[in-house]
């Protein structure tokens, strides 16, 4: 018997970006909605392996929301506020998000620290996107992931102090988010730079952003191995294992 997994999509007509509601930060992409939906089960399996869960198979995706956007969705630009993002969040669930973001941070750092050729440039990745030049080395991707941590916090907080170190910045963001959560749960919708945010959306986007760029890091490592530049690499997210 198939198990239903809910998916919410954002599209501009040129590409589709889908979020798996039961798996915070899990996503699929495709030029068409059918192409994206065909990737749901594999994405769910990869995600559950990363979390140390027994993978569920025979999943049937159900589209529960479609948001039409003018953003460059084909480049993973996103603004969607999921209906799920607005729901009440129990403290147990909030803490699960926090632990996932910590785990994701450690996974990113594992890839980065174990990379031998951090500044090796993958010229095939060079192109322009909505946020500028695509980072084409693991060093640049890591720096981009790090810089975005404060961006997500700034969507619902203007009181931000600079901290040193990737994990230190992450821990600071999570403490600030917890303080906001304890004050208002997930009851408030913030509008920042014309985009709607809630605490749950910030938490979800933290994990999603880690995963989408970690996948690029591992793709570069996979290419380095194929070219004989390295013997092995770390893939804690299980993207290609």
Annotated model-derived regions:
Residues 7-15, 23-29, 39-56, 120-167, ...:
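Short, contiguous alpha-helical
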Residues 76-88, 101-126, 142-151:
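A short mid-domain helix/strand-loop element embedded in enzyme catalytic domains
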Residues 36:
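The catalytic Nudix box helix
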Residues 2-4, 45-94:
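Short, charged, surface-exposed hinge/linker loops at domain edges
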Residues 87-115, 161-190, 197-216:
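Acidic/histidine-rich alpha-helical segments that form the ligand environment
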Residues 57-64, 121-124, 187-189:
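Short secondary-structure junction/hinge motifs that connect adjacent elements
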């Amino acid at each position: 018997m198939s198990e239903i997994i809910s998916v919410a999509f954002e599209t501009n007509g040129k590409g589709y970006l889908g979020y798996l509601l039961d798996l915070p930060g899990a996503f699929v992409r495709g030029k068409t909605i059918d192409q994206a939906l065909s990737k749901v089960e594999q994405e769910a399996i990869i995600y559950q392996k990363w979390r140390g869960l027994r993978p569920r198979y025979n999943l049937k995706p159900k589209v529960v929301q479609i948001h039409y956007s003018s953003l460059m969705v084909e480049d993973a630009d996103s603004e969607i506020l999921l209906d799920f993002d607005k729901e009440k969040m129990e403290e147990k669930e909030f803490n699960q998000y926090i632990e996932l973001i910590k785990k994701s941070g450690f996974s990113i750092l594992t890839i980065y620290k174990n990379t031998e050729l951090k500044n090796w440039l993958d010229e095939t990745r060079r192109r322009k996107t909505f946020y500028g030049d695509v980072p084409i080395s693991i060093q640049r991707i890591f720096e981009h992931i790090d810089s975005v941590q404060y961006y997500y916090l700034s969507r619902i907080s203007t009181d931000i102090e600079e901290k040193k170190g990737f994990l230190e910045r992450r821990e600071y963001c999570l403490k600030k988010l917890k303080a906001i959560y304890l004050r208002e749960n997930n009851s408030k919708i913030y509008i920042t730079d014309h985009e709607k945010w809630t605490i749950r959306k910030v938490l979800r986007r933290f994990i999603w952003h880690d995963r989408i760029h970690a996948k690029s890091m591992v793709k570069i490592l996979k290419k380095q191995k194929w070219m004989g530049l390295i013997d092995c690499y770390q893939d804690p997210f299980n993207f290609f294992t």
